[in-house]
Amino acid sequence: ADSFVKEIVTSLYGGDAYLIKGAFSRDFMINLRKRVHEYCKTKPSEFYKMLEGSPDFHRIIDLESGKKYSFRVCKHSYYFYPWNDDPLDVFGPVYERWRVIKFLMGLRSDEYEKNTPKDGVIDRIQVVRYPPRIGFLEPHSDPYLHQRLIFSGYMSKRGVDYQGGGFYLVAPGDNPVEIEEQIDIGDICVAYATVYHGVAPVDRQKEPTWESDDGRWFLSMYSNASDEVSNRHTGHPVKLSIKGVMPDEY
């Protein structure tokens, strides 16, 4: 057991990424995708900082507003916090998996679960839709201070729900590592937070709309420094010469 622990920690620190197959059921992910889309149809796009009492909300981040973020992005994000009433019953099944990953990161398995923004670090679940053609996330490094690993769940599949593009990791020499072909709905990926990664546009020939549920969906689970913290720790973009990972509009 000790040798396995040393081996996996060394591997993750060394920049290896792991695709954990079937971590969530396919039905759970597809159902969550549909429920999130329906739930937010009647609610306006809003924005709230991670401050005490912040509600759950969803926000359309178009190409223009996405330039104001730590790294450039275009997406439709749905944010859920554990201190609210969990309207879609997502925290139970997510925490079942997240606790294992937190333990792997050297945290208590229930670290941050009871925290609210005044405590400094908070858990946040984000369901993300990248619309066709314009949806993307530029190459970047995630914040690593409070969560050592990327922890992403996949809610759609390339070749079925969308064509081309999607998630990529970056190897030395600015070489993109293509893993989308190996991803199935319900899988999760873990890698050290400072491994460069991003999301390339999908369905480049398709006209995007914010009302539809097409495109690429994924589930993000992250422990963030809240906006109650001054000089909060954030991720940062990286300028890499990789072709085909930005929208044509860029």
Language-model segments: residues:
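N-terminal auxiliary "cap/dimerization" subdomain that precedes the catalytic jelly-roll/cupin core
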Residues: 1-67
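Glycine-rich, often proline-containing surface loops adjacent to acidic residues and nearby aromatics
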Residues: 11-19, 69-84, 163-166
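Extracellular structured ligand-interaction cores
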Residues: 15-17, 122-125, 136, 148-152, ...
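Structured loops at beta-to-helix junctions and adjacent beta-edge loops in soluble globular domains
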Residues: 23, 83, 128-131, 154, ...
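Signature of the catalytic double-stranded beta-helix
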Residues: 24, 61-124
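Short, conserved beta-strand element in jelly-roll/cupin
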Residues: 128-132, 144-161, 219-225
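Histidine-centered catalytic micro-motifs
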Residues: 137-143
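Catalytic core of Fe(II)/2-oxoglutarate
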Residues: 158-250
